[in-house]
Amino acid sequence: MRIVILSNPPDFSAYLSEMLKTWGLALYEGVNPDVLPALDPMDAPVVICPASEGVRRYAASLIAYARRGGTVICFLPEGALARAAGLENEGEKELPLRLRITAYPAKGLAGELLPVVGHVQTYQHASEVQVLAYLSHPGRYQGESVGITETRVGHGRIVAFAFDLALCVLLLRQGDPSRAEVLSSNAPYARTEQLAADIGPNDSGWIPFADLLSRLFVDLVRRGLQAPTPLLSHLPGTAGGMLLYSGDDDRAEAAWNDEEMDVVAAAGGRMNLYIIPIRTKSTTVDVQRYLSRHDVGPHPDIRALDGHSVTERLAEFERQIRMFQEMFHVPARSLRNHCAAWAGYLEPVEIMERVGVRMDASYISGTYLRNRDYAPYAGFGAAMPMRFCRPDGRLINVFQQHTHLADDEMFSRREYSYKFSLELFEVMLHRILTDSVTRFHTPYTVNFHPGNFVEFSGAQGQELLRQAAEQSLPVWSFDQWLTFWEARDTWRFSALTWDGARLQFILAGSTSHDGLCFMVPANYAGTSLDEVRLDGEITDWQQETRYGENMVLVPIPAEKQRISVSVRYS
């Protein structure tokens, strides 16, 4: 059993694959649409069809596949495919929009609406069509239309999105390329926050809306498989959430860095210190001391080139990354730009890929100098690491990990700060971390500058570490998280079968990590899991609740790269 993703570039097939992999559904295969006539729904129960100009050419084959019993998941269907799905296209829909889920509970949501941007069409639907979600305009009663539909076609079905999901998630997470280098009077230099797509009112900032939208897609795929599908856990061990801790060195004294690092280490955590190589006060000896317990990375500062060309700023960005590596003899694994300064759209990320940086933390939540929304996921709605994707659908091998809190923006007395007291932060933080552990199961990421930590934000930082311990959250550095994520990225499922009582599959990967686990549903179709075997040997497992679903977590043995798994239900 496998998931088939039709690949006919230019399209977003690679980004849809990245969504499946991000959420652990590593059971997919990209194929050319020409294989559709021979595709057996018993072997490939789900076919994902990205929005592209070529879909009309093989629409008949998609419809025939659905009639044979398969599930087609498509986006912006046209012509014969739209008619088979019981839809009639009435043209482009005005943006921005909100998606209201109506048929099935969506993971991580509790009635909230999801922002939708990008390319959206208005469809009328036939009476036999089941509507799974509706699209509406924020602040307006008129203009509602279907957002996601499901239609029986022969022995199978067609699930249709009225919008290009991949483009929508890309724009939400990475921002809008049309906003690159657009400056404002409040922030007269290019910043990552200024890329944020226009989603209308800030009513979704307390949920990682871009991630939950991609998770909705993944769960629709899972429904189509009609089996207790395994997933790679995206968190280490049995953790229900994560705290990713970092600090930007800026002009900090080495003693200030040590003070914050001591506090984090005493809490059992590890942090990243991001260093500006052109003006750090830390020596090579200092950095070696930091590395005994923590991680370091570059913090390029291109602000001296405000107003200069994108090309000049990119050259300085690359120069400082290389300078950091040469100064401290440390590979640059992850980074964050000083002041979140940026150049162009994805050009800095392409440089990261070229020089070996594999995770970027420069996209900061909130609406800094645009309005006064401080919610943890405001602006980009993302907490999960995903590879960057170019607007033409090609992936960049750099993971985008958003930063949710910067201490100067939240606690300082500066004009732009929200100026929250410790007492108020305690209440907000309890909500944020509780949601992370019980609803979203995603990392919460922070930047506590050492200079600020010793001056005004130390109490908030210690409260964060205290509540993280209370919620049993691992406290990791970005580099540590990246190491886990890179190892997880190598693992795939294959040869999956389900006979109604026994689930069997092969799990294989090239890089081990002691935090890696896979998980399967504890209950399925009236049955309950009662045994897991790895290579024929009964193994221990632990039941946890993830997104309201009882899941069984099984550690992946560190010494193995290929495992035969058998799971019995009764």
Predicted ranges, named:
Residues R2-A84, H308:
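Helical hinge/lid and interdomain linker segments adjacent to catalytic or ligand-binding clefts
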Residues R2-I3, A14-A26, R67, T71, ...:
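A glycine-centered loop/beta-turn motif at secondary-structure junctions
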Residues V31, F217-G237, E423-S510, Y524:
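C-terminal domain-boundary segment and adjacent tail
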Residues E53-H125, P138:
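A glycine-rich, often tryptophan-bearing local segment used as a flexible ligand/cofactor-contacting loop or short
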Residues A85, G240-L243, E253-A255, M261-P348, ...:
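Metal-dependent polysaccharide deacetylase catalytic core of the NodB/CE4 family, i.e.
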Residues K93-H119, Y123-H125, T151, D295, ...:
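Active-site-adjacent pocket scaffolds in enzyme catalytic domains
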Residues F163, L195-N202, G247-D249, V355, ...:
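Catalytic grooves of carbohydrate-active enzymes
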Residues D514, T545-S570:
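C-terminal beta-strand-rich structural cap/linker in extracellular carbohydrate-active enzymes
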